[in-house]
Amino acid sequence: KTLKEKWPLWITGTILFSVVYAISSFITWAVILAVVLFVAWLATKNKNMSLSLAFTVVALIGFSTHLYIPIRSELNPIIDENDPEINFRDENGKLILKNFNPNGENWRAFYDYLERKQYGSESMLSRAFYRRAQIDNQILVFPHMSYGGYQIAQYLPYKVGKVSYYQKGIYAIEADGNEPLERGPFKFPTLMASIGENELAQALIFLLFNGLLIWIVVIAWRKNLIVGIYLSLLYSICSAGLIWYINFSDGTKLERRDHASWVKEMDYVTSRFAEQGMVTSVTRTPDPNELLDIQRKIYADRAKGENSSKHEQNFAWQNWRKIQAMFQSAGLQSPPLPDPVHLEVRERDYFYAPAYIFMSLLYGLGIGFLLLNIQQRKAHMLNPSGIAIAVLCGAIPLFANYKEHNRANLWVPWDYAYNLLMSCEPNAIVFTNGDNDTFPLWFAQEVAGIRKDVRVVNLSLGNTDWYIKQMLDNPPILKLSHDKAGIDREFALSETNFNLPQQRIDYWVDLAEERIPRFMRRIESLSARLDSATTAADSANINAEIEKLNHPLQIFTALRNWGVPRRGGMMQTQYKLVIDLALNNPDKPIHLSTTVGLSNAVGLDRYMVQKGMILDLAKGNFAIAKDSIDIERTAYLVDSVFKFRGLGDGTAYVDGETRQLLYNYNSIYMRLAMSMKDVERAVHYADIGIKQFPEEWRNYAVAAEMLLSGGEVDKAIEYLERGLKEVSSSSGNRYLLQQLNSLNAKE
């Protein structure tokens, strides 16, 4: 009866929950609901109507905080992800009344932003129904994402740790990245190092933490059923609901869009084979996630020395082998397994903040129950017990987490951005990879005003139409071969243009093979004219024309060489963007951040020279040596320009993600050391690496190698012995020990 009387609350809750399942209709429904409830309340004075109206008004006020997003976007800031502005006026400043309709197309970009579609075209709710990770990795203990692992880390000095991926979707737990947490004389191993391969232990610890919460809720149920239901539902939504909704990836499965794209691509290829009369016994395209799972099991069996034939005989795996065989019989390179979506790029504990805050409230309630029990049984122990519990509740999390959360002297991201930008030539275009190597650069440019002449192009965002369009408007303005309509129509890959020929790599290979001879003929013709030039001015003009032609020839040559072994694949938008920007901006230096995988350079890396923290395209230069480094420019940057505040002196805490980023510094030092002919200068750069990264064994090995080349055996031995004391990784230690034993044996 009570539930029936509260029907307005149930209807109101269902409609207001549309902020999750139909965000584009939320404002319309909520406003209509508010009007209806207000009229109903005036007519009935029903308290359930008034409470429902209050909920609706508060929900609208809460949602209104997001309106700063389109207001900010309307001002066209340089960093304007998804471009979510809402245009209420035309170019002449007149109001457009239809644009006030919150269900209109004018609001679409705003809603897409709220649904995080700047990271993909799929809504968060839709994505939640396609699991992007193994469920145990999402719930128990796993790096960057696990609810249970972060739950433990809230209170205890046991951090989650890391895994290393050495094949697609296949990971291992290694010592590197799982260094124990030191607190005075105590060392606390990471959860991955201690129980990473023991799911039973993970489950037991998870049950311990959450069993206490269940116990607290059960007590609440016994004392007040309604309060108990409220607490259990709220915590379930904050925890299990968030795990399901956020749906973090563990690096073992594909994104839904990539899954659909790969299956569609394989269907297309196999149908082409069938049209060409090739015999095929492939009954259906295998599920790529299933293939990755089978491959993981095969590797696991082989690592244990067990027979993996039961997995290799799987129907899906056999179909995949047949597809690979068809490619080989057609004279094409066998397609590899698709790349799963990467493991979450950073720690995602902040997404679970509502659950952990509410969890703490429940633990506090449980402590209250405990103290109440103490008062009833041993009243004289109440005050001492309360004080002890209060002190422990504050001291343990402080002990576990203070060092990692103290930001004092943490200059590393600022200096990293400065160093990368200062590596760039004036007015350059520099391609970056993801968040960690991009946002610090944007901060340095827009907040600190450093090197705003450099255009940072993020390749992850380079797959989105809105980001590419902004390059045509926001300074530094770039030139593209398409206008905004063309970007939508054919440049940015989407479901509407998926079947266009230019979305296939073979189209671009054919284009390159058609353009290359044309450019070469023109260059040969100009070279012939150069031989007969009579004045220095004529020679200079002809050389300038040849240089202009060498630039696109170089780009198309790189594209062809990159594309031939990938002919059967899709031409991702970011690949087209790299080629397009390089072709249409000949006056701008083209750089690639050293954080970017070379495969993303679409073959241009073959003609690039490392200068500090970037690879610079040597335009039109076909004679450039592979993996070249400009020694003098890089040495000048390291010695006279770069900043390294807090590195090597113990003043800055460097977490795992930052350490991985900073290893780009170390690769520079090692390349410089190995490229120097002067032993003293070579050891100088190895010493910089040792100072900043004392646990990196390669620095000691390089220093010893350089000293040996100069005949300084004793000093080489000193470096190897020093490395053995500092280096904790077993593989590095073994190498240094092997080198040391070899030198001692010779003596």
Please report, for each region that a protein language model flagged, where it lies by residue.
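ER/secretory pathway lumenal C-terminal domains and tails of membrane proteins involved
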Residues: 1-293, 300, 317-427, 443-744
